[in-house]
């Protein structure tokens, strides 16, 4: 079982129940996406939209700030999670097997006909050692 700090779990629970999405910022960010990509993003749970916007903010502060595919990945990498409960999310974070284990593959399946390059990145966004760029992305994802 993974070691996860109490404060981390409390923060994530607060974000899950009351995600504070800045709608003006979200609308600005969505201009980067095609209509099909926007549709996928907007179908995500409020928590996953909030998380993705936080990852996007962090990616914008890295060497990937001008890399369109990684900026899109920040917004769409968790689109395969669906609307799962906080209990499932906590169990997954603690290392238990849950339906979230396959979310990267599900994200790939949702994105492959929309943007194959971003779909492949989404499929591999938890694979350590995939690429130097992915390592930068993973740090942003882990911190969000």
PLM regions and their residue ranges:
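Non-catalytic interface/linker regions that flank or bridge core catalytic/transmembrane domains
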Residues: 1-39
